[in-house]
Amino acid sequence: MADVKSAQDKAMEIAQMLEDSKAENVSVIDVSELNSWTDYFVIATIHSSAHWQGLAKQVKDYVKENDMEIHVTHNKAASGDDWNLIDIGSVVVHLMSADAREFYDLEKLWHGGKKLR
């Protein structure tokens, strides 16, 4: 029988993968008690558009390898470089520039969630 990974396991694996690929300040927040549309946020600081594209490809490859589905991918800025969101259902990945991360401060906004990393 195949080993079924929990949403938390997947969030932590994605976070580690991002950190291994030079994303900075990678955090995982359990927001399952705060909303009805996702369980975990993975938040990471990116350095450039090229860095974002590489990380997004890795996340998409992870999703495919783990029989998951991407629900939505959004660019949250006109340039598309400041905040990129990949929604895979129970996990939402936020890839943000340092400026966007400081400005939006998702960790503070979702302070009621349990920080796992």
Task: Go through each PLM region and give its residues.
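N-terminal presequence-like segments and adjacent domain-start helices
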Residues: 1-7
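N-terminal first-folded block
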Residues: 8-40
